[in-house]
Amino acid sequence: MALFRKFFYRKPPDGLLEITERVYVFDSCFTTDVFNDDKYQDYIGDIVAQLQCHFADASFMVFNFREGESQSLLANILSSYEMVVMDYPRQYEGCPLVTIEMIHHFLRSGESWLSLSQQNVLIMHCERGGWAVLAFMLAGLLLYRKQYIGEQRTLEMIYRQAPRELIQLLSPLNPIPSQIRYLHYISRRNVSAVWPPGDRALTLDCVILRNIPGFNGEGGCRPIFRIYGKDPLLATSNTPKVLFSTPKRSKYVRLYKKVDCELIKIDIHCHIQGDVVLECISLDADQQREEMIFRVMFNTAFIRSNILMLNRDEIDILWDAKDRFPKEFRAEVLFSEMDSVNQLDSMEVGGIGEKEGLPVEAFAKVQEMFSNVDWLDPTADAAALLFQQLTSSENIQLRKGLLSPNKKDFHLSSISPTKKQSDNVEDKLSNAELSTIYVHKQENNDVQGLIPQKQATIPDEKSGSSVIHEKMISLVHEEITQVVDINTGCLSSLDMTVPSTMNSSRPVLIDQNSKLDDQFGSLQSSSPTMIMSQQFPVSRSSSVLSSDFSPRLLSACPRFHSAPSALGITALLEDHAAFGDTKNSVKVSSAVVKIPSKQSSQQHPITVTPVVTKCTPSPPPLLPPLAPVVPVPSDDQMISQEKDMSQQAQKHPDLSSFPSLSPTQQKQSTSKLCQTILPTNHQLSSSNITKEPLQISPAPTPPPLPTPSTSSSSSCHCLPPDSMLSTTTALFRPPAPPPPPLQSPSTPRCSPVRTLASPPPPPAPTSSPVRMSGPPPPPPPPAPNSCPSRPAPPPPPPPPLASTSSPPRPAAPSPCQLHTSTSSPARPVPPPPPTLSTIRSSAPTPPLLPGATSAPSPPPPPPPCSSSNQLSAPPPPPPSFSKNNGSIAPPPAPPGGNAKLPGMRGRGPAPPSGPMSRSLQSGQAASRRSNLKPLHWVKVTRAMQGSLWEESQKTDEASKPPVFDMSELEHLFSAVLPSSDGKRSDKSGSRASGSKPEKIHLIDLRRANNCGIMLTKVKMPLPDLMSAILTLDDTILDADQVENLIKFTPTKEEAELLKGYKGDKQVLGECEQFFMELMKLPRVDSKLRVFLFKIQFPSQVSDLKRSLNIVNSSAEEIRGSAKLKRIMQTILSLGNALNQGTARGSAVGFRLDSLLKLSDTRARNNKMTLMHYLSKVLSEKLPELLDFPKDLASLELAAKVQLKSLAEEMQAINKGLEKVEQELTTSENDGPVSEIFRKTLKDFLSGAEAEVRSLTSLYSNVGRNADALALYFGEDPARCPFEQVVITLQNFVRLFVRSHDENCKQLDLEKKKALKEAEAEKTKKEPENAQKTKEPGNDKAKHNNSIKELDISLQSPAQTASAK
């Protein structure tokens, strides 16, 4: 069908651009030129005349996007041609969009008109300045009709039809993000049962800006907000108005810098409904000049989860302002249901006085202990003044009402179009409420300060001035003239509004009227002359124009005046017969230069001229690259190898005796040579091959070589032009062993490469065989396409090389030796130098490296049939040349020994000496060890000086290692079971036929192995796995398994590789079959990500909800703790006692970080701090406050929560829901394969949205509580966020508890010390008491002794003598 459309395609008339089938656009929409009335009428008339000749039986409808209430000039002109004209507004509050109702009306009208008859044609037109909305509506129509997929791609395709500078001229802001948002609304219309859904009345609570943009030159901004839309409190009025505007003169409109705060939170509390335009404007330092930060247009019916999260790519910004926004910029707009909006109570900062705390007199001793100690920061004077202001009775109230801006016209700066406020703004805006981060009352007298006078004026569109028009045209004049060359003129009015009436004499068909009534609903016509209109008056905003003028930013383009406009709809009834009767064959000479319109097909009408490339035939379906990549030798390496081989050839006179070929002969022979062997579809460009690595992988295991026959079929060896030398020494050269990278037991498959066109091959040249001197030749070989049916006995063992004679000079050199016979040994023709290899008796010629040949390696050849007369063993012809056994792969090379040509006499050629010889010998050694088990060591490639390995390389007999018995090694460490040679030859055929073919790997081997490991963990058949994915069954697959599946979804390159595979899919590897199965599902990667989100959604929501509850609990506990409040008041009294009589004294409050300075202020004896003293005083006088940490149970957990991370989690949940919704919409085009998937996903989405909506409400409440906590301590939420408040309190609590414990320990020590001292004193007094107790006994004894002595003295002398 596409071919028929191409043959029967008719170029559209001049002046029209075809967008898709039967949809055209006037080319005047792509220019800013202005026509006068006469020229414009001639321009339209010429196009209409061509249309009627081009589409003789067609009916036409014109959609016009214009401004104004009266009928447009286009409708007035086309009414005389019996064309239906429908007028739409070209903007909505300065944004090049229309309301969702207008979009729905346009889409239904366009779709119904085009589907009503195949002869109906739709034409789009816009007046000057309406190209942006016209492009959006065209993209919406294409998406609505499912002619294109992808919102951004479709919109960009439409914009490319006009010069790039046109949209930048017409719109100072980039409108594409908001337009894409509305295109999402259109493309996802099938998610909900009714589209468009009913307008939701919401309350816009606040706007949070994260990672502040820089708009003041100092890395910050001074933001204010304006909101435009329909007032939900006035159900009867659909007129948009200013719903909210931040007063400029408010003292809370201040500068926010990146270094001071990470986010800005602006409380708004404005009621909205339907289509809303939100503008964020940055004020200059003088609060007069305005600069647009961003603009967002959205519809409340499509707000999910009561939150709108935007990054810098999803907001309308100035064309050159993207660098002002950090990459991490986020704007969060939080909503709540209008009926359940909770008014925030006025928060008192708290009576931070001395009523409930200890009086100053209680700290009389502290002045002596902490005298002359600076415990406060010297810069804290400003903090004291701030607290005095914040605790005043006027400022602790949070909100009173919103100021109503006065109704005046004033223009924004050069970056914002103008708006007009409606008449009843003052009456309606009183219902909305304004608050910044900590919103306070505003007085009504601030209204006058909100509306300054104009500093400069911009010519209005209706003023008739053409100065601005000339400046606009001068910017894109060169580009516009390439599109159309029309003599421009100036109109006195840019808004072309002329009353339009339809021809009353035009007949009306009743049957068409009944059809169109059903299609167009409200567009019913009771009379042919009746014009149905709908009022769309648009209000203007209030702004100020800066004195500077920037033509690029279109300061001349005012904020599209949206005065009440009418949707003038001329009757939609068309009589096809009337068009046939009124056709006039009039020749009109067009005064307009014809514009070639772009041709297109029905499905993709808009085409871009492709880049002219060389005509290249498509290459044949070759096997895709397998593994691994062989490095391509450079040109220097190839030249050096050529020189080495030339020197080797000079050493052998028998090689240099051959006659040389002239360059012309070489070129001819080379071309003939390649054309003889390769078919046309196998020709490749060597220049392309040298730039692309050749990927090689082993082929299936080949069968062993049959016994050679005496007669064989020889084929010409294709020599590439790059490898041809000027002499035959390059052709007849000793073959070298194959390099190690190419050691393969079978013929590898080459990856398809890009080809260039080459002429078809001529017939193969006939060449007589070269006769050599020697014994008579054997019988001539059969035809090249034949092969012996039975094998012959092997030839006798070859004699030594020294006994052979050098071959004589050939009679006539031939570029392609088809048949040769000789009895003396002849050296085979080697491949080009980059691919030096020895032609083995059991393997064909090894593959050629890229760059060395212009053709891929031939397919697996038939079993070689060799004889003694063969000069070389070239590779057999491709499959098209072979008839028998052409698909049998060659056998592997035998382990050990030099490879020789089949049937050759004498020893094989010795490999060249030097480094190349060593490397080649090592490659041969590696091939000999291929049947042994590998030793997995870490190889050292370069011996360090003085190391053991350097010494081992010396030729010292003592250092030489012993010679190992290879047979013993093979017997002990063989990788495969050994088998006798006799049995091998006998059972070769049966083993080849019975062996299981190896798996073919198209994917990178490492990735394939990892994929196989992953599949072993899944442990289920692939069909069951696909079924689990489509049913989103989380009982079968868990999150880890789905994550692994996402990692192993095929990439775009892998998918293309697998699609190009045409062989048997059963022989593919496990990874390839898994990828094949995944590719059966459309957008399997997106489905798996949706599946993963569904599995993780409950845990994500529960974790986020738990964290939010912790923040709420901690904020409520801190604000509700009476003990903490009394302690704060006690600290205030303590500080005032210390600072009494100084500038820091008599404070009404203190900054929150001053709490930590209590531990830094030490007494003069350095034995205690103020924190210890505070604990001591509270223990003595207010002991009931010591357990205040028990009131802050959630403080520890709250200190671990970051509000930024909570915002990121909330954003991830919302983005995940958007992806779910997008996949649900896209999967409707998948067909029955995704039917269960859609049903399951729709059920999940309905429940998830309700849960996320409640989570968003909690998230918004947490944000308010976090800000209220900072305000509770008199802090600015922007400078002292919730995290800082909580961490400061946590550290204070820890320091207080530690100080209290230390005080308790110190008190215990003092008690013990006092006890010890008392005991010591008591012990000291006991000896004295004991001594005092002993002294009375001694006196008595002395008294007794004295009495005894007295008695003795009183005795008589006689008694004394008798006693002696």
UniProtKB/Swiss-Prot annotation:
Bias (Basic and acidic residues) occurs at 1317-1351
> Domain Phosphatase tensin-type, which positions?
9-193
**Chain positions covered by the region annotation Disordered:** 614-934, 976-999, 1317-1364
The Polar residues compositionally biased stretches are: 657-690, 916-929, 1353-1364
Q: Known Gene3D superfamilies for this protein?
A: 2.60.40.1110, Formin, FH2 domain, Protein tyrosine phosphatase superfamily
Query: Active site at which residues?
Result: C126
Q: Which domain of life is it from?
A: Eukaryota
- Extent of Pro residues compositional bias: 617-631, 734-743, 774-813, 856-865
GO MF, any single term = phosphoprotein phosphatase activity
User: Domain FH2: where?
Assistant: 922-1322
User: Compositional bias (Low complexity) spans?
Assistant: 744-757
- Kindly state which keywords UniProt assigns to this record, in alphabetical order: Hydrolase, Protein phosphatase
Pfam families recorded: FH2, PTEN_C2
Residue span(s) of domain C2 tensin-type:
199-338
As for family, the record states:
Belongs to the formin-like family. Class-II subfamily.
What the entry lists under PANTHER family is as follows: FORMIN-J (PTHR45733:SF8)
Kindly provide the name given to this protein in its UniProt entry: Formin-like protein 6
What high-level taxonomic lineage is stated for the organism?
Answer: Eukaryota, Viridiplantae, Streptophyta, Embryophyta, Tracheophyta
